């Protein structure tokens, strides 16, 4: 599968280079013998698109005679990138283009200087003034609109959490190779797997964000946030349904049928064949296919009984943080390249992210053939009707509130507190933080 993916990416990037070589209808940068150098900040580790980031940047640089892009990886996901951006901004330095996680939409727009995509288009790409409206569906663009109604950036990486299953282990344990469909069944499967095979039954991703856990609790009817009649936003996850959801995973960890380890360790345990089920982003699809030496598949995110599936949109949008004219122009030219059909296809093939642009899936030079052959993408695509926004705390509380959620998760999964104790105390602390703004 590894060679097939790399070949597919190479073919799609060849198309993207042809587009660039043919020239695009955008205002050229000021005449200069030297290239304009810009930084592109991302948080894609090698196992989650980092190699494809490098390939996209290398191909752009090879075909562009006036811009050089330098990609900079930021560990600890979008929270880590925001912390690094905060440190750079304090010194007056900004990268040109950055990935911003959905959970930090309001925090970013409240605390950092940026150029809206339409403003960049209106100045540097006037011949393609309706690019956003032509290439993206309104509900997709809405994901990158802040609470003030401004289009802060353009959706880039779209993901949903799916359940990866090792069908070989399921068969060995005498379970259905189609996997569980509800969270109650996930718990039952995990227990049987541990008893029959001695292997771990389940792992839920634990990176530096609460994204997967939001899907867990909101699918049970809980809400991360609530809005009062006066518009006040409060944390609301410590409801009976939210507590039940988190306690289910904590109980699996306590009885030894589930893992409580870092994201990389959990991923490695799954692809090594030591854990039967892994709940994580579809963006790990490519890395999983390349590493797993067993019958691997994905199934849709489990529901709670007959309740509707509710899952947060994962991934990020791209925002222009360049401050000078040449940097802004270069950032937009590179960003538009990233949104070409060919580049979008390469991004999906190399990761698993669902393309946000509306004409990529069916395009001959896009994903038409790939999606027809790659069934592991189906689970993510088929559950897009259950997607909601990743909870974004209002005002300046985003980073601190997210860290509180991570500390709460570690305490609950680690057995230091019950779900009820941890969630109620953390909810109160976050609401005190929000009220103090």
Language model: regions and residue ranges:
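Glycine-centered hinge/linker elements that transmit conformational signals in sensory
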Residues: 189-192, 230-260
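Extracytoplasmic/periplasmic substrate-binding proteins
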Residues: 43, 57, 212-215, 244-333
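C-terminal capping/gating helix-and-loop segments adjacent to ligand/active sites or protein-protein/ligand interfaces
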Residues: 312, 375-430
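Extracytoplasmic "Venus flytrap"/periplasmic binding protein-like
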Residues: 59, 63-136, 172-174, 276-277, ...
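Hinge/lid segment of periplasmic solute-binding proteins
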Residues: 102-160, 214-216, 297-299, 368-371, ...
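Mature extracytoplasmic/periplasmic domains
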Residues: 34, 44, 59, 113-115, ...
């Amino acid at each position: 599968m590894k060679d097939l993916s790399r070949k597919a990416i190479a073919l799609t990037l060849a198309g993207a280079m042809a587009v660039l070589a043919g020239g695009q209808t955008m205002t050229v940068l000021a005449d200069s013998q030297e290239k304009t150098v810009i930084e592109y900040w991302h948080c894609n580790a090698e196992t989650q698109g980092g190699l494809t980031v490098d390939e996209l940047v290398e191909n752009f640089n090879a075909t562009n005679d006036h811009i050089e892009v330098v990609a900079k990886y930021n560990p600890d996901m979008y929270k880590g990138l925001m912390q690094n951006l905060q440190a750079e901004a304090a010194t007056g330095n900004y990268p040109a283009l950055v990935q911003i996680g959905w959970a930090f939409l309001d925090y970013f727009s409240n605390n950092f200087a940026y150029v809206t995509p339409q403003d960049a288009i209106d100045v540097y790409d006037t011949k393609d003034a309706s690019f956003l409206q032509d290439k993206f569906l309104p509900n997709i663009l809405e994901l990158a609109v802040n609470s003030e109604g401004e289009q802060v950036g353009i959706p880039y990486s779209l993901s949903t959490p799916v359940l990866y299953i090792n069908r070989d282990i399921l068969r060995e344990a005498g379970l259905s190779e189609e996997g569980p469909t509800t969270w109650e069944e996930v718990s039952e499967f995990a227990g049987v797997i541990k008893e029959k095979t001695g292997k771990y039954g389940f792992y839920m991703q634990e990176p530096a964000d609460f994204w997967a856990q939001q899907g867990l609790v909101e699918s049970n009817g809980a809400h991360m946030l609530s809005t009062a009649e006066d518009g006040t936003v409060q944390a609301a996850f410590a409801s009976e349904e939210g507590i039940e959801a988190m306690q289910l995973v904590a109980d699996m960890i306590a009885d030894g049928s589930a893992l409580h380890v870092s994201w990389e360790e959990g991923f490695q345990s799954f692809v090594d064949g030591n854990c039967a089920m892994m709940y994580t982003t579809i963006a790990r699809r490519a890395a999983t296919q390349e590493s797993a030496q067993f019958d691997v598949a994905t199934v849709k995110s489990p529901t709670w009984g007959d309740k509707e599936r509710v899952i947060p949109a994962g991934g990020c949008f791209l925002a222009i943080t360049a401050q000078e004219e040449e940097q802004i122009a270069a950032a937009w030219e590179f960003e538009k390249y990233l949104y070409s059909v060919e580049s979008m296809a390469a991004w999906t093939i190399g990761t698993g992210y669902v393309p946000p642009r509306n004409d990529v899936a069916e395009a001959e030079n896009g994903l038409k053939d790939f999606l027809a052959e790659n069934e592991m993408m189906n689970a993510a695509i088929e559950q897009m009707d259950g997607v909601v926004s990743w909870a974004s705390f209002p005002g300046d509380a985003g980073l601190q509130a997210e860290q509180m959620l991570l500390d709460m998760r570690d305490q609950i999964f680690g057995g230091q507190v019950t779900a009820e104790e941890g969630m109620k105390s953390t909810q109160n602390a976050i609401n005190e933080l929000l009220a103090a703004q």
